[in-house]
Amino acid sequence: MRSRKIPLVVAAAASASMLLASCGGGGEDDGATTGTLDFYTNKAAWEPDFDELNAASESRADITLNTTGYSDAEQYDAFVRQSFRTDKSPGLFTWQTGPSLAELVEEDLIAETTDIWTKAVDSGWVSTDLRETYTYDGKQYCVPMNIAYWVMYYNKNIFAEQGIEEPTTWAELNSIAERLTGAGITPYYQTSTLFTFQWFQQMVAGTDPELYEGLSTGEVKYTDPRIVDIMETWLDQEEAGWFSDAGSTTDPAVGLKQGDYAMINFGSFFNGSLDGAGMVSGEDYDMFVIPATNPDLEQTPVAVESGPLCVAENSSQKTLGLTYSEWWMSPEAQTAWSEARGDVAFNPKATVADPMLEELGTTVASDDYQLYDRYYEATPTPILTVALEQFGAFIANPGDPMPFLETIQAEADDYWAEQE
């Protein structure tokens, strides 16, 4: 496993130090399996959802979450890292998958959850693909707090008016884009800020999942001829007018509603935004899993975004945190969480309030699909930062992809050289 240097966030770390000052080493596990569990999260806006979930966890597991939410990401990260040096290590906390989680695992700061995952997989509660996201050197750490599958949303009225059915192949999807363009309708949404990676992610993984993985490990260069060919295809699509105005300030959900474009590639959490814009799930909008670019792939790759719930190895509430984590994986817990958050459940045996999301969860859990980590989590942070900027620049002013790819690769070369 590759490791990376942990960035220091000095100001936030100092703040965290004052909160946890001079507490000494880690606390001894008290062995409790019921009671109040101290839970820290960087999703402060979700506190009401976790509070709502307490009704289920109290009655089913006899555990109540005492939630402390942070809205500042840097301050939260510094707080958690500092807590590992004290006797206040959290019994349960949220984090990020990918290199950020790998750092904590490599430093032996996270409690192992292999037994929990084994039970969940054997019970049909979770896919083996998702387990890989939480696997380091053959062992599992943390459990998924939430999950989002990156799919294609579409305006049902536009599809109906144009006589379009959901595509099952990449060729059919391209034909749809051509048909829409011919009718004066922009096929796809795009933006030049932050969410600039998804079309690149989709085409690379849909061409060859191993090629995509190679970018995240440094085994494949961004200037690889196969990557260049994919970018050339993207350029052709841009020049054909398949994508929306990258500089538009219209809310993406509103844009789909009013027909600024027919489709948008987004995470399955986007249902909430569309509902908030006044669209009705299954009536005004629907979704489909994007077909693989390469028709010869045996499984259709699906990007997955998952945020972990972790237990600190030296927490005095380690056993309580692991007990809650085991319950969290169950159908009853995920049903309750779906009711509280309105999200798709990673457990295919859970009941999801939105039939569309329930169907999606069941679909991608089948053997016909292969889950892979979203580019945002799969890519080391220094490379990601440059890549998002370069993809955004390419989207804003489409042109020869090589200068953009060379800039990303220069950062990748520097990063991987430091890992030797």
Q: Can you say where each PLM-predicted feature lies in the sequence?
A:
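Extracytoplasmic/periplasmic solute-binding protein
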Residues: 137, 141-145, 150, 174-220, ...
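Conserved N-terminal structural module of periplasmic/extracytoplasmic solute-binding proteins
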Residues: 2-102, 166, 279, 290, ...
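Glycine-centered hinge/linker elements that transmit conformational signals in sensory
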Residues: 179, 217-246
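Hinge/lid segment of periplasmic solute-binding proteins
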Residues: 98-150, 174, 282, 286-288
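C-terminal capping/gating helix-and-loop segments adjacent to ligand/active sites or protein-protein/ligand interfaces
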Residues: 343-344, 361-413
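A structural signal for short loop-to-beta-strand junctions that line the ligand-binding cleft
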Residues: 82-83, 90-91, 122-157, 186-187, ...
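Short, solvent-exposed loop/beta-turn-alpha elements that line the ligand-binding surface or hinge
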Residues: 114-126, 192, 208-229, 276-280, ...
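Extracytoplasmic/periplasmic substrate-recognition and gating elements
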Residues: 228, 232, 240, 277-340
